[in-house]
């Protein structure tokens, strides 16, 4: 583990990782459409060897293992031990002998070589040194091997994240200050030109980026959507940093922001906007 990545790794092995592990089913339900779009772009084939970067609770790793079949192999890697415990249990329950997991930092760990596909669903935006990380990942690929991942586009295109955060800040009388758009986090890969530069610098070619938007169902009521938002996403961090005593105020503010956006039956759906990125290792 590098010193630069230590903060991220500590978070994903603490309360954050435990919370995501506990909410695995709900989180997977919401992001599955994006993962499916990335899987279609990756087109894993029987017999292929795949590395799933930032595999989390193993949802995409299991799908990849199904696609490559008994003659293929999938390695899911993640820094979060709590989430990997869920992933391993799910792999056992699905009887996937071609699937394994390792608790390592993909940006620097020794990874299998001659891999056919490096894949990730929302797992590559947290690298502290993304240029170095993708140089390292390319070394694991065979000649003409593929790298395919999905990442969030800009916050302005993702109201699922910004509506709740804006409401929380207003409730606390906080004005958003300047921030580093490239800092490790959900939106670090929003800038398509920077993503292209990272991959090009790492030695990839045939770089393609496709926009994929999907309405995200955050909850069946404004209240349940607000409760979910305070567990996952940018507003959850803001709420924690504001202090436990302010959680009721923030929850009520987010609920009020979601209420006029609810559909007739109460469902709260807000747009999620992503890049599906693919590239090839020329050798």
Task: Label the model's feature ranges.
Residues 68, 91, 168, 199, ...:
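Conserved hydrophobic residues forming the short capping helix/wall of the S-adenosyl-L-methionine
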Residues 49-109, 132:
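Class I SAM-dependent methyltransferase SAM/SAH-binding core
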Residues 116-131, 153:
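A short SAM/SAH-binding and catalytic strip from SAM-dependent methyltransferases
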Residues 1-48, 59-63, 83-86, 105:
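Conserved class I S-adenosyl-L-methionine
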Residues 42-44, 68, 141:
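A generic alpha-to-beta junction signature in SAM-dependent methyltransferases
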């Amino acid at each position: 583990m590098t010193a630069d990545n230590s903060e991220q790794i500590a978070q994903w092995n603490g309360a954050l990782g435990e919370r995501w592990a506990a909410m695995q089913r709900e989180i997977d339900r919401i992001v599955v459409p994006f993962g499916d779009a990335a899987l279609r772009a990756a087109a894993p084939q029987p017999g292929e060897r795949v590395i799933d970067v930032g595999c989390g609770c193993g949802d995409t790793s299991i799908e990849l293992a199904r696609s490559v079949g008994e003659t293929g192999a999938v390695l899911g890697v993640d820094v979060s031990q709590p989430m990997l415990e869920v992933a391993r249990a799910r792999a056992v329950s699905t009887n996937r002998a071609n699937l394994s997991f390792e608790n390592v930092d993909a940006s620097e760990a020794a990874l299998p070589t001659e891999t056919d596909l490096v894949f990730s669903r929302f797992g590559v935006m947290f690298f502290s040194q993304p240029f170095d990380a993708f140089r390292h990942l390319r070394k694991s690929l065979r000649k003409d091997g593929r790298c395919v991942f999905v990442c969030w586009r800009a916050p302005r295109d993702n109201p699922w994240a910004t509506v709740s955060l804006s409401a929380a800040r207003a409730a606390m009388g906080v004005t958003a200050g300047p921030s580093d758009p490239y800092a490790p986090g959900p939106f670090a890969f929003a800038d398509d030109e920077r993503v292209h530069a990272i991959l090009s610098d790492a030695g990839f070619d045939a770089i393609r980026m496709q926009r994929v938007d999907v309405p995200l169902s955050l909850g069946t009521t404004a209240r349940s959507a607000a409760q979910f938002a305070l567990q996952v996403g940018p507003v959850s961090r803001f709420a924690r940093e504001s202090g436990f005593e302010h959680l009721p105020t923030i929850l009520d503010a987010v609920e009020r922001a979601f209420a006029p956006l609810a559909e007739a039956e109460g469902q709260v759906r807000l747009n999620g906007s992503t890049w599906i990125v693919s590239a090839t290792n020329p050798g």
